[in-house]
């Protein structure tokens, strides 16, 4: 039986690969997509998500979400993904539109209609998920678990200790991590290992139309290079759903720092139990890189 999932995303070049995997992995049933401001503005992430759905002729409803973080000014990662968020490929025009309700309400409504609890996957800032949990707490029993790409047990990528998705809205992340729902965190500890090699990247233009499109996007992606390999951060969250045996998980207490002058957005991961607090997150700490690369090749070969 296919696993029903809802995907909250901020496309983003590596988001595009994650969306492809969510659509084409035969083990998954992508039922709803929502967008959030993150890599670029929410207007751009929504446009990019709709372009991808049209490219793959995927009839999946999409709702536009939060334009700004809960309490602080927005930040973006245009330096990594380009000003549009998906520079490098000319998508054809379409007339698709997002749903007429905010993302968190679309998630609420879809959860309440679902015949069984649904897995949420969040690969951008956690603003929409925090709004859902704070404004619609009655939804919690309908969430099977939340798998996120975000955080780090060690070094960051936008400050010395903070990962971008968490640092973009620390208050939202703190709300989510305190919520009591089951959470799996795929942070930089594994995503920095999730590299597509130059040899594989060179094969993409001849793979299929998706490979050709992704290769064009990758030439504008600044998380690595075509010569040294590219990090597929967001794709790890999808891989964990399909191939959990590739990941080493450890239950830990995780809190999000929201006040520190130099540490705001840091995920404080208590690996050794120093704080004596019960674990609230399963943290991915290691990745079978070869197995991950093999799975990526398999799923992208299906994305025609």
Swiss-Prot record:
Q: Which UniProt keywords apply?
A: Glycosidase, Hydrolase
As recorded in UniProt, its EC number(s) are 3.2.-.-
Q: Name one Pfam family in it.
A: IU_nuc_hydro
Q: Which GO terms describe its cellular component?
A: cytosol
CDD domains documented for this protein = nuc_hydro_IU_UC_XIUA (cd02651)
Task: Name its GO BP terms in alphabetical order.
Answer: purine nucleobase metabolic process; purine nucleoside catabolic process; pyrimidine nucleobase metabolic process
Domain of life, per lineage: Bacteria
Question: What does the protein in this record do?
Answer: Hydrolyzes both purine and pyrimidine ribonucleosides with a broad-substrate specificity.
Family named by the database record: Belongs to the IUNH family. RihC subfamily.
Q: What is this protein called?
A: Non-specific ribonucleoside hydrolase RihC
Q: Which organism is it from?
A: Shigella boydii serotype 18 (strain CDC 3083-94 / BS512)
């Amino acid at each position: 039986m296919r696993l029903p999932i809802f995907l909250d995303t901020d496309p983003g070049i590596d988001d595009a690969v994650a969306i492809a995997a969510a659509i084409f992995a035969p083990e998954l049933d992508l039922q709803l997509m929502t967008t959030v401001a993150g890599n670029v503005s929410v207007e751009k992430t929504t446009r990019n998500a709709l372009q991808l759905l049209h490219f793959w002729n995927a009839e999946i409803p999409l709702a536009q979400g939060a334009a700004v973080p809960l309490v602080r000014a927005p930040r973006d990662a245009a330096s990594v993904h380009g000003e549009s968020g998906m520079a490098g490929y000319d998508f054809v025009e379409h007339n698709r539109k997002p749903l007429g309700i905010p993302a968190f309400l679309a998630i609420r409504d879809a959860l309440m209609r679902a015949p069984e609890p649904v897995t949420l996957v969040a690969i951008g800032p956690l603003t929409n998920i925090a709004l859902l949990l704070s404004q619609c707490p009655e939804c919690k029993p309908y969430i099977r678990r939340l798998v996120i790409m975000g955080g780090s047990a060690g070094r960051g990528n936008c400050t010395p200790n903070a990962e971008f998705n968490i640092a973009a809205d620390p208050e939202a992340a703190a709300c989510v991590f305190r919520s009591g729902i089951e959470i799996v965190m795929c942070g930089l500890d594994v995503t920095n290992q999730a590299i597509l090699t130059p040899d594989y990247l060179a094969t993409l233009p001849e793979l299929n139309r998706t490979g050709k499109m992704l290769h064009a996007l990758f030439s504008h992606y600044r998380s690595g290079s075509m010569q040294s390999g590219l990090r597929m951060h967001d794709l790890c969250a999808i891989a964990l759903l399909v191939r959990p045996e590739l990941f080493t998980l450890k239950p830990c207490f995780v809190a999000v720092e929201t006040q520190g002058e130099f540490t705001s957005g840091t995920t404080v991961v208590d690996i050794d139990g120093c704080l004596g607090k019960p674990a609230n997150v399963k943290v991915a700490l290691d990745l079978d890189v070869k197995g991950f690369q093999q799975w990526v090749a398999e799923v992208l070969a299906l994305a025609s």
